[in-house]
UniProtKB/Swiss-Prot annotation:
It is a single-pass type II membrane protein. It is found in: Vacuole membrane. Disulfide bonds: none annotated. This is Probable dipeptidyl-aminopeptidase B. It comes from Penicillium rubens (strain ATCC 28089 / DSM 1075 / NRRL 1951 / Wisconsin 54-1255) (Penicillium chrysogenum). Residues 112-903 are vacuolar. The chain crosses the membrane at residues 91-111. Keywords: Aminopeptidase, Glycoprotein, Hydrolase, Membrane, Protease, Serine protease, Signal-anchor, Transmembrane, Transmembrane helix, Vacuole. It catalyses: Release of an N-terminal dipeptide, Xaa-Yaa-|-Zaa-, from a polypeptide, preferentially when Yaa is Pro, provided Zaa is neither Pro nor hydroxyproline. The lineage of its organism: Eukaryota, Fungi, Dikarya, Ascomycota, Pezizomycotina.
């Protein structure tokens, strides 16, 4: 189900695992620049001075849970997301006190009393809320958050897309910006200060306009990739989406000096290219067209075919659907060696993979018109989609010798057999060596190979049996960093930094030489690194990474030396925070992104000293901060509950003007996929915010067992039986909330999208109407035998090895679903990820048992995100109106309809 890509709308993210998609060290050749980034706004001098959060401290509260606050959040009033003026707040409260002083005094006395809410189950921890003063309702002033604002992106923080690039002579501190400035659409800036003792390079404009001219026609740029020497730019136009991460387009080579463009392949102007990448030496481009790999040397207008037999079943250099979605979360399967002499690429044979038909009733994504007489038939796209137990694509790694114009491959000792192998990472090292990471089909054995392309030999350097270690699995990651030998700096051998399992948590380890089975552990403790490492400064011998060291819900940036000493934070850990970072080519500079809990900001930092220095604050989101001041934002209460000995993170969103003497309906929002995370400290204004702010309902989210960043024991417990423990944790937490004095236990609902849709149905099935009366499931899996093999078998094994687990995990007890008051199911008809088959099979089960307490809506031609014909807005409008009807009791009236007498 791909990596968990948090785009600020997590409920619509397809079935994924959480990886907190770091901006880790993007270079200009990693991905095309497609988002505008304006020039720097402010210059900050003064050492390690963070931009201030500002604002009142009552939007969210930390909650003590049975004396276990040390497990996550400190028992303090944490930072804020509001950014409003504290002086103005004092004036407002003074006026309130003058007007209703006696009432406020009695209210404060009431609130300062400890009022424990007894848990419904003895296995769950008692929660005591400690509220700092009378501001229990949070920001009650202002206008409620509207659904239109959420859907239009009005509440989305602004962020800037910049990519780092090494200078022609390896200079650090150069970044590529793309924007709309006059005659400076794409430019390279040198952010190094004269204080660093370097001569700054002049800002260089690579592309003056956001379009190119060729043969009298202007074509708008969709993506751009500067060459490493910055003399040319690879430009893509006419982009056409394929799957979630892949696309087609026309590619051009723009000469920076003349600003003239030529086709990537002058002999084929109409060809749709799937992928193109510069050589590190800037003298060639490798590209994929119609699943074949080609090379264009800039000294010639001719292209050289590297492969010739690519077709609809045989892919070269690009992943097929399942590898794109579940392994790489991207569109590339091609990797240049650092010296530009070799190209490594995947050969994917999916001949044996069964097809699944995707039907389109209102559109024709192929762009082709049907033959006469067939206009009234839907277009059908057959995709190769391996389901659990069915044949997977057979993937091998091949190499191309640029000088010899030769394709070759060679056997690796102790390799997996073809139908067991999943290649999850390819990393070039020095002198023609390359690291290959593979897993078996069920993703519980990982092997690391080192291949020597010059000697054409391979060696197994590491093998980890994850199933034997903790019964879990390994996630496909692409963050390994090669550390080249440097005897002068104490590194006699090549090595690499990798994430490994250490004492039940994900930590960083340094392996040197490659085949050393005993690594240097760089991090240790009851916390985890995230998509690490982020970067390595080879000059200083420092490894930078993001981790949950302060709390599972937080992210801070740290550094540690290659010998494992001197681990220190780069960000302020004295208050809750959620940071991300991307580093420059040499890791001397970085783009630091603060994502919450206050209004997000971005700054360029200098990491060359003992402490970080802020160079430029490039985004403060001033307008967003003003919106927060003027809006009625829910109070967020962070706490944790303990279920069966596991401490789980909980977020409660309380409506503005929250009154503890009232009875509120409660909506549980969940995702719950293996390794995912929904409760975090990011600034988020989403559908859940709208529900609390505008509809006045309480919204609760709990990350149950199986989710990420609370240790592998809690995560791996769900293997082979997904849905079971996760549903228990939602139900147990819901019973705790149902017992609270301010909750109406007769009005409780649960909702989710994708894996969250599956979990919604699983919760309703296991609960059987005891706790939850309502549920809303969007694009749900209902039987894991219907989902793709690589994702499902990672957590469930194959159906052959675990038939009872698949049976237990399916939504099968429809009689239990019938005990809820009502539930809603929505699905896109053209969903290539979670097929409509899931919903249709469940509907048939309901029909067979005459269960009719549900509503269903499908969206023609919409995929997993449900976007076709503006359907995304329709989904949320339906969720909102359906929930209002539920909590208003309308579905009780429809349960046993009676005819009215005629008048």
């Amino acid at each position: 189900m791909g990596k968990f890509e948090d785009d600020g709308n997590s409920e619509s993210v397809p079935l994924t695992r959480q990886r907190s998609e770091s901006l880790a060290s993007q270079t200009s050749t990693d991905s095309g620049l497609s988002i505008a980034s304006e020039s720097f706004m402010k210059n900050h001098k003064g050492g390690n001075t963070m931009p201030t959060d500002g604002g009142d401290g009552d939007r969210y509260l930390d909650v003590e849970d049975g004396g276990e606050t040390g497990l996550d959040e400190p028992l303090i009033s944490s930072g804020t997301k509001t950014g409003s003026s504290s002086r103005l707040r004092k004036i407002v409260w003074l006026l309130v006190l003058l007007c209703v002083g006696g009432w406020v005094l009695s209210f404060v006395l009431f609130l300062t009393q400890k009022r424990p809410d007894t848990a419904a189950l003895s296995s769950a921890s008692t929660v005591e809320i400690h509220e700092p003063g009378p501001a229990t309702g949070g920001t009650s002033h202002g206008k409620p958050v509207t659904l239109e604002q959420v859907l239009s992106g009005t509440w989305s923080p602004k962020s800037h897309a910049i990519s780092w690039i090494a200078g022609p002579d390896g200079e650090d501190g150069l970044l590529v910006e793309q924007g709309e400035k006059q005659d400076a659409f794409l430019r390279v800036k040198d952010i190094r200060s004269s204080e660093d003792g370097v001569d700054n390079l002049e800002t260089r404009v690579l592309m003056k306009k956001g379009y190119i001219w060729f043969d009298g026609e202007a074509m708008l740029s969709a993506k751009t990739w500067p060459s490493p020497d910055m003399n040319r730019v690879l430009v893509m136009t006419d982009i056409q989406s394929n799957w979630r991460h892949s696309y087609f387009g026309k590619y051009w080579i723009l000469d920076v000096a003349t600003q003239k463009a030529e086709p990537l392949d002058p002999g084929n102007l109409s060809g749709r290219v799937q992928l193109a990448a510069w050589s590190p030496t800037s003298d060639a481009v490798v590209f994929v067209r119609e699943n074949n790999l080609y090379l264009r040397k800039l000294t010639s207008l001719e292209v050289t075919p590297i492969t010739k037999d690519g077709d609809e079943n045989l892919f070269y250099g690009v992943p097929d659907w399942v590898y794109e979605e579940e392994v790489f979360s991207g569109n590339t399967g091609t990797w240049w060696s650092d010296d530009g002499k070799f190209v490594a690429f995947l050969r994917t044979n999916e001949t044996a993979v069964p097809e699944y038909p995707i039907q389109y009733f209102r559109s024709r994504p192929s762009g082709k018109q049907p033959p006469p007489g067939l206009e009234n038939y839907p277009e059908v796209r057959q995709i190769k989609y391996p389901k659990p137990g069915s044949p997977n694509p057979i993937v091998n790694l091949q190499f191309y010798d640029v000088e010899k114009n030769e394709v070759f491959s060679f056997e690796m000792p102790e390799d997996f057999v073809d139908d067991e192998r999943i290649i999850i990472e390819v990393v070039w090292a020095s002198e023609g060596k390359v690291l290959i990471r593979e897993t078996n089909r069920e993703s519980d054995v990982v092997k690391i190979f080192v291949m020597d392309t010059k000697a054409r030999t391979g060696k197994l350097v590491r093998s980890d049996d994850i199933a034997a270690l903790d019964g879990g699995w390994v996630e496909p990651t692409q963050s390994t960093r090669v550390i080249p030998a440097d005897p002068k700096n104490g590194r006699p051998h090549d090595g690499y930094v990798d994430t490994v399992i250490y004492e039940g948590y994900d930590h960083l380890a340094y392996f040197t030489p490659f085949d050393n089975p005993e690594p240097v552990m760089l991090t240790k403790g009851n916390w985890e690194v995230v998509n690490a490492p982020s970067a390595v400064d080879l000059k200083k011998g420092l490894v930078y990474f993001v981790a949950t060291k302060e709390a599972p819900t937080q992210r801070h940036v740290y550094s540690v030396k290659l010998d494992g000493s001197d681990l220190r934070p780069l960000t302020d850990t004295s208050a809750p925070g959620f940071f991300d970072v991307s580093f420059s080519h040499g890791a001397g500079y970085g783009l630091l992104s603060y994502k919450g809990p206050a209004v997000p900001w971005q700054a360029v930092i200098n990491t060359q000293g003992d402490e970080i220095d802020f160079i430029n604050l490039i985004e403060e989101n001033v307008e967003l901060a003003k919106m927060v001041e003027e809006s009625a934002i829910p109070t967020e209460v962070y706490s944790n509950v303990t279920i069966d000995g596991y401490t789980l993170q909980v977020l409660e969103r309380r409506p503005p003007n929250f009154n503890p003497e009232k009875k509120y309906p409660v909506l549980f929002f969940l995702y719950g996929g293996p390794g995912s995370q929904t409760v975090d400290r990011k600034f988020t204004i989403d559908f859940q915010t709208y529900v609390a702010s505008n509809l006045g309902y309480i919204v609760v989210t709990v990350d149950g067992r199986g989710t990420g960043f609370i240790g592998r024991e809690a995560r791996c417990l769900v293997r082979g039986n997904i849905g079971h423990y996760e549903a228990i944790d939602q139900i147990e937490t819901a019973k705790i909330w149902a017992s609270k004095s301010y909750v109406d236990e007769s009005r409780m609902a649960v909702w989710g999208w994708s894996y969250g849709g599956y979990m919604t149905l699983k919760v309703l099935e296991q609960d059987a109407g005891e706790t939850f009366q309502y549920g809303m499931a969007v694009a749900p899996v209902t039987d894991w035998r219907f989902y793709d093999s690589i994702y499902t078998e990672r957590y469930m094994h194959t159906p052959e090895h675990n038939p009872s687990g698949y049976a237990n995990a399916s939504i099968d007890d429809v009689m239990a679903l019938g005990h809820s008051v009502r539930f809603l199911i929505m699905h896109g008809v053209a969903d290539d990820n979670v097929h409509l088959q899931n919903t249709l099979v469940l509907i048939d089960k309901l029909d067979l048992k005459n269960i009719d307490n549900y509503d269903m809506q499908v969206f023609p031609d919409s995929d997993h995100s449900i976007q076709f014909h503006m359907a995304h807005a329709l989904v949320y409008e339906r969720l909102s109106s359906w929930l209002i009807n539920a909590f208003n009791g309308e579905w009780h009236r429809t349960a046993n309809p009676k005819p009215q007498e005629s008048t």
